[in-house]
Amino acid sequence: GGSCGQCRVKIKSGGGDILPTEMGHITKKEAKEGCRLACQVAVKTDMELELDEEIFGVKKWQCEVISNDNKATFIKELLLKLPEGEDVHFKAGGYIQIEAPAHVVKYADFDIPEKYRGDWDKYGLFDIVSTVNEDVLRAYSMANYPDEKGRIMLNVRIATPPSANVPAGKMSSYIFNLKAGDKVTISGPFGEFFVKETDAEMVFIGGGAGMAPMRSHIFDQLKSKKTKRKMSFWYGARSTREVFYQADFDALAAENDNFVWHVALSEPLPEDNWTGYTGFIHNVIYENYLKNHKAPEDCEY
């Protein structure tokens, strides 16, 4: 417990002193206001607490898989259809939880496009079998933005075993095996990674499947809210084959003078003929933007 920091509550009375395990997720100011992690609070006496209003809006739906396509070598875009007339009332940057029953999944059954199969063969991934003997629940950020109604879009990276003694990712293995028409149970919405209502410059930094909340935020700001705040998006990938939604972000940059986006490749391939930024994205944004920024501390990240 205490590792994800998602179960924040405000304790008005009771609950005892805040624990060291909580301080990595809660600032000193928040602690003074009674903020705690519910999983770390021992209930020994009567308590009074305050919950965010959004919690009471959490619902559960059985969705249908519309598509489950590779967007990169190890990343799928899972697109789910909500029941007719239903919608998830979420804020950009929010997440849902997805349920998986006990299952046995053979990686050989995954639908992987030919252009990506070479890497899967190289690492022997099609030989993996994921056996899960209990129900599993995992959280994923939504890649769609609130005005994309009636559906849920997720970017999921397969969690392959780091060694022979460690099992494959229970949920990612389940998700990678989903096919159009399959039924999936989700619940939500949840989240705290929301844009603040200020005029501050926004700097979005992400890589890999971390694309999901970036897409949600940026599309929401530019397509729905029509913000004029200065915005930049810095995305890291291994090679051009691992970059997705490129045409969408190119179009947004062309349509909005206040938005630019940059890609940095850590391992560009010879056929990429890459002339852009290279290296890891956190180093690239520092060296090429934040190092000489007038007031990086004033930006919203």
UniProtKB/Swiss-Prot annotation:
EC numbers: 7.2.1.1
Localisation per UniProt entry: Cell inner membrane
Record's keyword terms, sorted: 2Fe-2S, Cell inner membrane, Cell membrane, FAD, Flavoprotein, Ion transport, Iron, Iron-sulfur, Membrane, Metal-binding, NAD, Sodium, Sodium transport, Translocase, Transport, Ubiquinone
InterPro entries on file: 2Fe-2S_ferredoxin-like_sf, 2Fe-2S_ferredoxin-type, Beta-grasp_dom_sf, Cbr1-like_FAD-bd_dom, FAD-bd_FR_type, FNR_nucleotide-bd, NqrF, OxRdtase_FAD/NAD-bd
GO molecular function, one term: 2 iron, 2 sulfur cluster binding
UniProt-listed SUPFAM superfamilies: 2Fe-2S ferredoxin-like, Ferredoxin reductase-like, C-terminal NADP-linked domain, Riboflavin synthase domain-like
Reaction it catalyzes: a ubiquinone + n Na(+)(in) + NADH + H(+) = a ubiquinol + n Na(+)(out) + NAD(+)
Keyword Ribonucleoprotein included in the entry's annotation: no
Name assigned to this protein: Na(+)-translocating NADH-quinone reductase subunit F
Organism classification: Bacteria, Pseudomonadati, Pseudomonadota, Gammaproteobacteria, Alteromonadales
Name of the encoding gene: nqrF
